[in-house]
Amino acid sequence: LNVYGFITTPDTPLLLFFSLFLFAYKNYLTKKNTVSYLLLTLSISGMMYSKYQGVLIVFFIVLSNWKLVKDYKLWLVCLGVIILYIPHLTWQYINDFPSIRYHLYERASVASYRIEYSLMHFVNAIAIIGFTFIIIYKAFFRGIKSTYLYHKGLNYIISGFFIFFLLSSFIG
């Protein structure tokens, strides 16, 4: 049980494609076959269609494994993602980029920063995981120095999201 379980319902497509992405990435690390490249293309596109935070997941994986940028087939994956994402980009262009306008200009923001915003980030990090947060955090910090690329990627995703949203709490 966790406090914010009801919030995960709108994120179900993101969770589906995130899971598929992790499966594809693990498959890529071991096999580097056509199936893994196609699954990466499909899962990244799906994450981007689900929520823009999907780009953070990909960014943190690349940050954890810089050798990915040397694989030219992964650049083809990027091209495939862009091709699959063209309908959304076209819609954004036709409608004067409503998502960008909302997130950068129209979203209700607080006039001044208060320390409570950042402190609540830590409280929420515990509440989201639920009653097992001690076990989860112990397991995370125990494996933080893993050299296995898949585990290293998972650690970067967890740390990256925590730091990203902590920094965004300073905005208000």
Predicted regions, residues:
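Structural signal for membrane-spanning alpha-helices in multi-pass inner-membrane proteins
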Residues: 2, 22, 61-65, 88-92, ...
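Short acidic/glycine- and proline-prone juxtamembrane loop motifs at membrane-interface regions
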Residues: 3-13
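Residue-level signature of transmembrane alpha-helical entry/exit and packing/kink sites
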Residues: 11, 33-40, 53, 73-77, ...
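Membrane-embedded alpha-helical segments of multi-pass membrane proteins
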Residues: 12-20, 58-59
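Membrane-interface transmembrane helices that cradle and orient dolichyl/undecaprenyl
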Residues: 21-37, 140
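Membrane-interface alpha helices of multi-pass inner-membrane proteins
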Residues: 35-51, 62-63, 81-83, 162-166
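Transmembrane-lumen/periplasm boundary regions of multi-pass, lipid-linked membrane glycan transferases
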Residues: 57-151
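Transmembrane alpha-helix segments characteristic
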Residues: 146-170
